Regions:
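Conserved acidic catalytic loop of the alpha/beta-hydrolase fold
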Residues: 86-95, 99-117
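Conserved alpha/beta-hydrolase "acid-adjacent" motif
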Residues: 252-258
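Conserved hydrolase catalytic core segment
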Residues: 115-157
């Protein structure tokens, strides 16, 4: 399958993207989550969508992968205060928010001269999708939200076993091998117990991601963008386009109740709960999601 790679000037920054399928076919824009490069939309998953008759675009969000790193922006103050405020649905001062990342999406579509697209977001990408679909309904044909949240008050937080490695990282001075091992361990913790990857597969994926880009400071800013935005509920309720919300029963990072909250707040949204799916996209769930 041919992949058209490029860098888009969007919202004052550069976004690396990959564009697949016939440019005359209906476009699907895939938005990935926290600390996740575009490669975490598996190529096989994208190929299924192309074979189904779609043009597929995946891209690196700001501060990740090959897109612009906003290293001049600094996060100040204790993160636990922002985390507690976020649990109450309250915003906090941060370098940028999910609103800025939604503007990146608009800029990418403008650059590619795509008037409207089917927009699918995973995790933080699903949060960006909610903001974008509410603010720019004319740019959205339909909405897909995978293991995400409204971030409204009193939703269950991540399990400590999933949150701890996300917050702590591999540690200062970690070697490349230690960084890769930490990434593989984290992917196993949040992964789908019904559709597990082998250790060799996880190490290979972590190695590929590390070789492409490693920028932990950008992940910190992305995480604070989530915390600083506050509740999305008032945006979620404004989504009018056909919407499917997909969540796994075994997600330890963004709990199933969070996906259910999204579906409750979007008129006529369809909720799909996948048994044994965690916070990843293993091949065993691709057919279910793409259909």
């Amino acid at each position: 399958m041919d992949i058209r790679r490029g860098v888009a000037e969007a919202n004052g920054i550069e976004l690396a993207y990959e564009d697949m399928g016939d440019v005359l076919h209906p476009p699907i824009l895939l938005i990935m989550g926290l600390s996740a490069q575009l490669t975490l939309w598996p190529l096989g998953f994208c190929e299924l969508l192309v074979k189904a008759g779609y043009r597929v675009i995946r891209f690196d969000n700001r501060d990740i992968g090959l897109s612009t790193k906003l290293s001049h922006l600094k996060v100040s103050g204790p993160v636990w205060k922002r985390f507690l405020r976020a649990q109450l649905g309250l915003p906090s001062p941060v370098p940028y928010t999910l609103h800025d990342m939604a503007e990146d999406v608009r800029g990418l579509l403008d650059f590619l001269q795509i008037p409207s697209a089917h927009v699918v977001g995973a995790s933080m990408g699903g949060m960006i999708t909610q903001v974008f679909a509410a603010k720019y309904p004319q740019r959205v044909r339909s909405v897909g939200i995978i293991f995400s949240s409204t971030n409204q008050p009193f939703l269950p937080p991540p399990k400590p076993s999933a949150l701890k490695p996300l917050m702590s990282g591999p540690g200062k001075g970690a070697t490349r091998e230690q960084i890769i091992a930490h990434s593989a361990k984290f992917m196993r913790i949040i992964g789908s117990p019904k559709y597990p990857f082998t250790q060799d597969e996880l190490i290979a994926l972590a190695t590929e991601m590390n070789a492409r880009s490693y920028h932990p400071a950008g992940v910190v800013r992305q995480f604070n963008a989530i915390l600083g935005t506050g509740s999305l509920k008032h945006f979620t309720r404004r989504i009018e386009k056909p919407t499917v919300v997909i969540h796994g029963t075994a997600d330890p990072l963004v709990r199933p109740a969070c996906g259910k909250a999204i579906a409750r707040n979007i008129p006529k949204a369809r909720l799909v709960i996948i048994p044994g799916m965690g916070h990843d996209l293993p091949p065993g769930v691709w057919e279910r999601i793409t259909h």
